[in-house]
């Protein structure tokens, strides 16, 4: 079974790039759109994952200067995807699938899809 959640957040950032770019060397803002898909087996409460938990994680980025958030010192769409995956997967069981897509604009997004694998030590 799969669940899906989408949510927007507004934030500012600046990118440090070795070439000239609209997003480089100038603080600017975006209304980002995040999409999250989680696939797995529902728990004893009939839920794969609580939608509110997804919203709470995304809300930590809302109305922030992203460069000041630990782990987002270079806040590209790609790095925001990885930052979100790291936080969401902490609450997922082994074998669950997670996909996160972050839209920087109506025409541009980054996404990553993973299968959660826990490493067991003997």
Protein language model regions, located:
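Charge-rich, low-complexity N-terminal segments
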Residues: 1-122
